[in-house]
Amino acid sequence: MSGDSKRSIEIYDTTLRDGSQLEGISLTVEDKLRIAEQLDSLGVHYIEGGWPGANPKDDEFFERAKEELSLETSVFVAFGSTRRAKGKVDQDQTLANLLGANTEVVCIVGKCWDYHVREALQTSLEEGVAMVADSIEYLVANGRRVFFDAEHFFDGYKNNPEFSLQVLEAAAMAGAERLILCDTNGGTLPHEVEQAVGDVVEHLDVGVGVHLHNDAGCGVANAIAGVKAGAIQVQGTINGYGERTGNCDLVAVIANLTLKMGYETIPEDCLSRLTPVSHHVAELVNLTLNPQQPYSGSSAFAHKAGLHTSAISRRPDAYEHVDPEIIGNGTRFVVSEMAGRSTLELKANDLGIDLDGKVLGDVVEVLKRLEYEGYHFEVADASLELLMRGASGWKQDFFEVERFSVDMNHVGSGSRAWNEISVEVDTRAVVDLFVDGKKMVGLGDGNGPVNAIDTALRSVLTGSYPELKAISLVDYKVRVLDTEKGTGAVTRVLLDSTNGEANWTTIGVSENIIEASWQALIDSLVYGLLHSPHRDMPQSE
């Protein structure tokens, strides 16, 4: 570690503005308020709320934030731009909106690349500098702390370093507390960031920050390079959300700077919030978190090969670069055809299932055979648990299915894509089963076979197991495993289910898609009943 390794690095989150520019994200005001609460619980230093005056949504957000947000650790920031070219600061609506937001800190963006000043603003370089200086001076005079986002700094510094430094000098002289060097196009490489940041830190006696995009895949690496060169603030977003390919991921930045380089970032007792906040924000922006997301992804500390899991059972640090519990994640053992006895034994132990001796070896062989047939248990933990419990001697006694049938009535002809005649499909399922020794018949109508079968099962089972009312199917995935066989190919079905508190995935494989769906559905209901809070978990025999 370097001699300054314990200096504090400010974490500035711009998920609510820059992060929301990612394709596919559209935040409501309520979403933004909830995300701000999550960021505050994480202990970031600054939360950029958005651009007041830019749209009605941001205006409402800033108004509600004044009344509804009680931040304990974070400082709220309003974002905007410099005055217009040839304009006056006291007549500029953007600056007026910034003051109207009533935040302690404002962050304004200004051009730092001569090419943009001439071509985008279509004004002189002298006026470009004046726009920055005048705006900062005006905001400071009105009692605001000002951060200056030097837009396109790294590209500008390559092209005309004298002008880029002149803009920064003017911003510092006008009273900016932080000079944020922005890689707006995201194409700068780490060695270039380190050199440029080092030059600015040496040249100016004002705190320097970095704002990195990920277009070259270097967002996090560039943040680290900037800090090494003397930057004291990193701007980024949770999970790296942002326009185009995103911004630098603050989850990885915080973890790397804190755990690997010894810098102080967020409060130490907040590090365990990194993974929960990462997942919570993903839910709020309505995007599935990448399982391979560094540090916070569900696969970040997952181990599939038997050799790895065998070593981890003895020495966790053998195949894990940090202790996952520090950042709120955990070790996960994935069972697949690559897994050996040690992987399966660790998985069983986690679930409280005794699979010692010959039984363990038999289960390993069964799993390998099933995976060869098309099962994929590493993404279907619920079905895997039921299989292992069955091998240990447990038998599910919630219900016993005798038979089921599905009828479909199709009215109309042809494809809806080209046929103007309306097409109607009615589906009915009949299920014969035993509950508590009594034979019962369930009937169910639905918009498809799976829905109809689910309805038929519930029509009988809910009377004995009212907890099924809380269980719902949230996703249904079908994959054809051998496309060369056409309509006769083997199909794999994955069902995602929830009871409102936990989620689980089950699997079915068959040449018949309805049979594959049936397998996954039965596993889903059995697993949900098994893990009902009203029921004790079974013990291995």
How would you label these PLM feature ranges?
Residues 185-188, 195-314:
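Catalytic alpha/beta core domains of metabolic enzymes, predominantly
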Residues 464-498:
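Generic long, charged, amphipathic alpha-helical segments
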Residues 181, 236-243, 258-267, 327-333, ...:
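Short beta-alpha connecting loops at secondary-structure transitions
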Residues 72-79:
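A glycine-rich helix N-cap at a beta->alpha junction
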Residues 343, 445-463, 512-528:
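Stable alpha-helical structural segments in soluble proteins, enriched in small hydrophobic residues
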Residues 500-538:
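Mixed-charge, glycine-accented linear interaction segment located at domain edges/termini
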Residues 5-9, 15, 255, 261-436, ...:
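A mid-to-C-terminal "edge-of-domain" accessory segment
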Residues 9-11, 17, 21-47, 62-71, ...:
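Alpha/beta enzyme core
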